[in-house]
Curated annotation (Swiss-Prot):
Disulfide bonds: none annotated. Homohexamer. Forms an RuvA(8)-RuvB(12)-Holliday junction (HJ) complex. HJ DNA is sandwiched between 2 RuvA tetramers; dsDNA enters through RuvA and exits via RuvB. An RuvB hexamer assembles on each DNA strand where it exits the tetramer. Each RuvB hexamer is contacted by two RuvA subunits (via domain III) on 2 adjacent RuvB subunits; this complex drives branch migration. In the full resolvosome a probable DNA-RuvA(4)-RuvB(12)-RuvC(2) complex forms which resolves the HJ. Residues 183-253 are annotated as: Small ATPAse domain (RuvB-S). This is Holliday junction branch migration complex subunit RuvB. The gene is ruvB. It comes from Bacillus cereus (strain AH187). Has 3 domains, the large (RuvB-L) and small ATPase (RuvB-S) domains and the C-terminal head (RuvB-H) domain. The head domain binds DNA, while the ATPase domains jointly bind ATP, ADP or are empty depending on the state of the subunit in the translocation cycle. During a single DNA translocation step the structure of each domain remains the same, but their relative positions change.
Length: 333
């Protein structure tokens, strides 16, 4: 598990907190307006027809609210949600056990659905399309296939890597929603709401400062607030002020754009050793001592989002914006 303070991945300490902070309805849900408005229509239409909602695929960077939306979908439809993950379903029998336990209309939420094994996907296809399950009884020449009917259900899949899904699986989702990074104003609203739950006073400017450094991600915003709250209680009077916030985030090595020491290491490594690029991913991996898939999936998305890094056919290139951020001049060609 990624232990970075600024990781969008869920950490152990996040689980209970996220549950207590989780909105229960689309009306309470902040941000993701496009996805939210579309889901409102699809859910209302399904309820009017007294049908289950089409299968939903939620994709985008970690920490943006995919699990929260899955639970909201179940709440809005008035049904139960069963939660599992791609890595937890190791055999077709594991999936069969989950599917046969569902009640009519239930939501089955599979996180990290891109990590399902292909043999398990093949069991899932008829379940998604025809609400039935084909299982093999016996072994060898006496083995026979039996089809079991399943109650109608809605599969909600979540992934940070939509491109890693097989085309047959992706095509079976009727609703595809990409979750985008949040704006500073949206994150500030989330920070202030979280502070209310914590029963901590926070200045509006402090909430904005945390939001600016949260990399567009609610999970990171809430995590930063927890750490700043610690400083406010120990080094201040308990109120999260702008002064306390800036001091805390500086000590936590989170700069004004939400970059940490690993981001600095990656960008400065390319600048100082490869004159800003282009440089191949594997070379970057060897230079900073991180696995290439971790760089690609965890570190790079935000750097691409803010325009500090470019991916080109020839390799990674650090942009003029990054040089400006570090107070450095770009090398002359």
């Amino acid at each position: 598990m990624d232990e970075r303070l600024l990781s969008g991945e869920s950490a152990y300490e996040d689980a209970d907190l996220e549950y207590s902070l989780r909105p229960q309805t689309l009306r309470q849900y902040i941000g993701q307006d496009k996805a939210k408005h579309n889901l409102e229509v699809f859910i209302e239409a399904a309820k009017m027809r007294e049908e289950t909602l089409d299968h939903v695929l939620l994709y985008g960077p970690p920490g943006l609210g995919k699990t929260t939306l899955a639970n909201i979908i179940a709440n809005e439809m008035g049904v139960n949600v069963r939660t599992t993950s791609g890595p937890a379903i190791e055999r077709p029998g594991d999936l069969a056990a989950v599917l046969t336990s569902l009640q009519p209309g239930d939501v089955l939420f599979i996180d990290e659905i891109h990590r399902l094994h292909r043999s398990i996907e093949e069991v899932l296809y008829p379940a998604m399309e025809d609400f039935c399950l084909d299982i093999v009884i016996g072994k060898g020449p006496s083995a026979r296939s039996v089809r079991l009917d399943l109650p109608p259900f809605t599969l909600v899949g979540a992934t940070t890597r939509a491109g890693a899904l097989s085309a047959p699986l992706r095509d079976r989702f009727g609703v595809l929603s990409r979750l985008e990074y949040y704006t500073v104003d949206q994150l500030s609203e989330i920070v202030e709401r979280t502070a209310e739950v914590f029963e901590v006073e926070i200045d509006s400017l402090a909430a904005l400062e945390i939001a600016r450094r949260a990399r567009g991600t609610p999970r990171i915003a809430n995590r930063l607030l927890r750490r700043v709250r610690d400083f406010a209680q120990v080094r201040g009077n308990g109120t999260v002020t702008m002064e306390i916030t800036q001091m805390a985030l500086e000590l936590l090595q989170v700069d004004k754009l939400g970059l940490d020491h690993i981001d600095h290491k990656l960008l400065l490594g390319i600048i100082e050793k490869f004159r800003g690029g282009p440089v191949g991913l594997e070379t970057v991996s060897a230079t900073i001592g991180e696995e290439s898939h971790t760089i690609e999936d965890v570190y790079e998305p935000y750097l691409l989002q803010i325009g500090f890094l470019q991916r080109t056919p020839r390799g990674r290139i650090v942009t003029p914006l990054a040089y400006e951020h570090f107070g450095m001049e770009m090398p002359k060609v």
